[in-house]
């Protein structure tokens, strides 16, 4: 390929990009590129700023990945050579190592007959990378380790950990955000209280996939079923397909409960990974170090902290970002209380058709049920998705109704927030005032569906109605119980009719948009 074929140069003139696409992600396209100084091929990761901003949380994850890759240097961690923002083309660019053999998942599917020694070699390299991450001060947790995020050079057998966009720097003793890929997530991740040993659990699932060529929990139909099995300690069916008892025991060791789970260093010393009885010189320097996190008296905020507050959504934010930028990316949320049970549903829109949601149900006993799931905005319905959770979460018919209504409400909020990106900042203060002004019994009952930090509803008309109701309810604190009950009934009817009207309006809006798109597509 001649240099004349290149389509773009970086600001320094060192790297040139070709039009050869190596891969595509949700918001990232990877091209083949060339380093003219070193004379080597590299990967050019190109992300549209507009696409990134439209996907809540992705900007923070991208910042996290760039920040970490700049500071981490290890043979088994993917190298970042250069990164910059292109204001002219409205893009974010990263130059990284090139792995033409792709991910370990694809490589293993392509080469199904592999000697166990090769798999043990890959395992050693992954553990060395994890040992390096976990031995940082403070430790770095990958949180999304899977074979899809591990890359291989087929010519040398070198394996490297990549995709650190969800990694967390542990400034506090335990992290608290539920994030990752369900099939590879440790049980304690769902409890929102975990440390770097969650990566060891994920590594065990990677080992299982490498040995069996099968994705863990393939027998499950949805994420709710995976959640129930993981939190109940039920292992994937594919574990029974591991014939070698020593390999099976090694994998089971990785999947032990967190207090009994070994560290990366301890696994590297396992007899299964021994290289002809030789001692690995790369581990000698830190062989006497343990990495069980201690409990510091206080946590201080730093640029890469995992931000946590009770009853709020959690995200990784750069302290350099303005509050307005973070507000545009924050997760939408719906809360309800019914029959002494608290329901909390949060979600973010990943693209035009997909949304990711997290449901938490807390009973009066203090025990909580949690599940993460995806929602297709074009094909899924709230009732169908909730129906899939009945068996896994042991839901009552009343709970099914409440959750389905919450999903519908969250979808409307996500769609409205997509259409009106600044609505959150305009109306949040009004929501807070409304939440604080609930004095009467009627007000408390009516507003059980509104959270003070929910964000906007469906635009100006919704806020006007809620504002009027809030003012009216404040003036009704002295009415009789009979009048209160009658008024509550009437308000519930009004709310039901109002919500139905809002849903119809949203459907009409979507139909009009689609009609306009089709018209312009025909013209073009």
Swiss-Prot record:
Coiled coil ranges: 480-523
List of residues that carry Phosphoserine: 477
Pfam assignment, any one: Pkinase
InterPro entries membership: Kinase-like_dom_sf, Prot_kinase_dom, Ser/Thr_kinase_AS, WNK_Ser-Thr_kinase
Reactions performed catalytically: L-seryl-[protein] + ATP = O-phospho-L-seryl-[protein] + ADP + H(+); L-threonyl-[protein] + ATP = O-phospho-L-threonyl-[protein] + ADP + H(+)
Catalytic residue list: 163
Domain of life: Eukaryota
Residues at which ATP binds: 96-99, 146
Gene Ontology molecular function terms on file: ATP binding; protein serine kinase activity; protein serine/threonine kinase activity
Keywords: ATP-binding, Coiled coil, Kinase, Nucleotide-binding, Phosphoprotein, Serine/threonine-protein kinase, Transferase
EC number annotated for this UniProt entry: 2.7.11.1
SMART domains: S_TKc
Residue stretches making up the Protein kinase domain: 16-273
Transmembrane segments: none
Known role: May regulate flowering time by modulating the photoperiod pathway.
Similarity annotation: Belongs to the protein kinase superfamily. Ser/Thr protein kinase family. WNK subfamily.
Name of this protein: Probable serine/threonine-protein kinase WNK10
């Amino acid at each position: 390929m001649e240099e004349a074929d290149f389509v773009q140069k970086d600001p320094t003139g060192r790297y040139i990009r070709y039009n050869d696409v190596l891969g595509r992600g949700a918001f990232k396209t990877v091209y083949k590129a060339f380093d003219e100084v070193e004379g080597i091929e590299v990967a050019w990761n190109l992300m549209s700023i507009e696409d990134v901003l439209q996907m809540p949380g992705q900007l923070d994850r991208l910042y996290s990945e760039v920040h970490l890759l700049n500071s981490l240097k290890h043979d088994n961690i993917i190298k970042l050579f250069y990164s910059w923002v292109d204001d002219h083309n409205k893009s974010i660019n990263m130059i990284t190592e090139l792995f033409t053999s792709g991910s370990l998942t694809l490589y293993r599917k392509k080469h199904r007959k592999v000697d166990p020694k090769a798999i043990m070699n890959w395992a050693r390299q992954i553990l060395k990378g994890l040992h390096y991450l976990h031995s940082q001060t403070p430790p770095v947790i990958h949180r999304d380790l899977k074979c899809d995020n591990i890359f291989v050079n087929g010519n040398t057998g070198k394996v490297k950990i990549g995709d650190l966009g969800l990694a967390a720097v542990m400034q506090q003793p335990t992290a608290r955000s539920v994030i990752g890929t369900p099939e590879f997530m440790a049980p304690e991740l769902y409890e929102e209280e975990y440390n770097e040993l969650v990566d060891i659990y994920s590594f065990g699932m990677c080992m299982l996939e490498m040995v069996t060529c099968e994705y863990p929990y393939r027998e499950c139909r949805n994420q709710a079923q995976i959640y129930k099995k993981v939190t109940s300690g039920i292992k994937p069916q594919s574990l029974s397909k591991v014939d070698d008892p020593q390999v099976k025991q090694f994998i089971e060791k990785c999947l032990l409960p967190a207090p009994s789970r070994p560290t990366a260093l301890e696994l590297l010393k396992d007899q299964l990974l021994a290289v002809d009885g030789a001692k690995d010189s790369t581990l000698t320097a830190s062989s006497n170090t343990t990495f069980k996190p201690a409990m510091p008296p206080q946590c201080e905020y730093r640029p890469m902290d995992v931000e946590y507050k009770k009853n709020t959504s959690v995200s990784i934010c750069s302290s350099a970002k303005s509050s307005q930028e973070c507000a545009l990316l924050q997760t939408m949320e719906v809360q309800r209380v019914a029959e002494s049970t608290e329901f909390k549903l949060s979600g973010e829109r990943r693209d035009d058709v997909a949304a990711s949601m997290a449901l938490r149900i807390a009973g009066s006993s203090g025990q909580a049920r949690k599940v993460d799931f995806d929602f297709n905005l074009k094909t899924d319905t709230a009732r169908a998705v909730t129906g899939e959770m009945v068996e896994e979460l042991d839901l009552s018919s009343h709970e099914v109704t409440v959750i389905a209504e919450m999903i519908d409400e969250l979808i409307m909020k996500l769609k409205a927030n997509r259409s009106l990106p600044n609505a959150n900042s305009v109306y949040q203060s009004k929501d807070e005032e409304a939440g604080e002004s609930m004095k009467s019994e009627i007000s408390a009952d009516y507003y059980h569906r509104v959270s003070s930090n929910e964000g906007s509803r469906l635009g100006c008309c919704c806020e006007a109605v809620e504002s009027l109701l809030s003012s009216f309810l404040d003036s009704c604190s002295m009415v009789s119980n009979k009048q209160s009950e009658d008024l509550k009934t009437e308000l519930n009817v009004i709310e039901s009719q109002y919500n139905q009207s809002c849903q119809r309006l949203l459907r009409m809006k979507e139909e009009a948009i689609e009609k306009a798109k089709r018209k312009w597509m025909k013209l073009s």
